[in-house]
Amino acid sequence: MTQANLSETLFKPRFKHTETSALVRRFNRGSQPPMQSALDGKNVPHWYRMINRLMWIWRGVDPREILDVQARIVMSDAERTDDDLYDTVIGYRGGNWIYEWAKQAMDWQQKACQEQDAMRSGRYWLHASTLYNIAAYPHLKGDELAEQAQALANRAYEEAAQRLPGSLREMEFAVPGGSPVTAFLHMPKGDGPFPTVLMCGGLDAMQTDYYTLYERYLAPRGIAMLTLDMPSVGFSSKWKLTQDSSLIHQHVLKALTNVPWVDHTRVAAFGFRFGANVAVRLAYLEAPRLKAVACLGPVVHALLSDPQRQSTVPEMYLDVLASRLGMHDASDEALRVELNRYSLKVQGLLGRRCPTPMLSGFWKNDPFSPEDESRLITSSSSDGKLIEIPFNPVYRNFDKALQEITDWIHHRLC
């Protein structure tokens, strides 16, 4: 089936789909305090979703393109779930968040199909994949339109990979007790087996959101990247997130001995946000298999155990947490009790001595991840490194931090 036909088949005009902000029915929804963080963006008044400009621009989206799509959403006079929130237009039509971002992605997909130059076509496919992922953001369970956008994002990503430098392999890994999971192995030029980074992404991202990390930071250092969707989303959607948050990644890590392109004696894990919960767990449970673990803005204890910190987090992020935990109808109190069990300190891991080298980067006054969180990680390691990342200029400092982190990983793998 062609890309155009797939888009038409998936996105037939319908108005019965539950709108994204209505999927999680939590009680005691409060007012939204202003909040901004480098990795998550900020909660802008009159928007349900956090507007994550840094990460979208880092993934290659032009700031003007973001504003253009936002303007189309704002200008819509279609029915909304909440008249006060622009991005809650009901149904797949003009003004709906998923519709507008998917429409933008389809324009790039069409350009990719018409482009004769393979490299340029690959770039356009990659851009289309990124925009489809933004359409599906924040990837709540049961969001049918978002799941269709994710399917198109994955297809576009596969098309891009065929045309861009290096090589990409789509791999299936068996996980006992449930469905297999699909991972993408990105390999730089040269002969393998390669030292490899196992990417553990945030809860509001897809595994295809990290190509920039591979292309700009890992591939130039001769390091491969293996990506995997977090439980309950994407290719891991049949798995619920549990207190054993690293279950899927752990089985994949063990299976790397059978992957000929990966040097299983030189593997590191890199965790963004809640992905750090997975990565640090692996540092304790699979120390012999990991040479190093790096974290960025980790969510391993404070946000999971401190009700006051949870009360400052935007509604969308609490909805993401509730969705991942399968608690679509939970009160905030029930959600807090459950989240506490995901703290690696409560689980008795963090605070114990860990032989795996661990690095953690943090921003001062990060509402999701205080400095103490990163200090707890690095002080628990027999070889810890702490990095403070200045907030402004946000993009340049983010790039500089990633260069420093990947240098540290390279030093331990190569």
Swiss-Prot record:
State whether keyword Hydrolase applies: yes
Sorted alphabetically, which NCBIfam families does this protein's record hold? Answer: PRK05077.1
* Keyword Hydrolase recorded: yes
Q: What does the function comment of this entry state?
A: Catalyzes the hydrolysis of esters.
- Give the species: Salmonella arizonae (strain ATCC BAA-731 / CDC346-86 / RSK2980)
For this protein, what reaction is catalysed? a carboxylic ester + H2O = an alcohol + a carboxylate + H(+)
Regarding protein family, the annotation reads:
Belongs to the FrsA family.
> Which Gene3D superfamilies has this protein been placed in?
alpha/beta hydrolase
Record's keyword terms, sorted: Hydrolase, Serine esterase
| Domain of life where this protein originates | Bacteria
Q: Which residues form a coiled coil?
A: none
Q: What are the recorded GO MF terms, alphabetically? A: carboxylesterase activity
Protein name in the entry: Esterase FrsA
Please state the Enzyme Commission number of this protein.
3.1.1.1
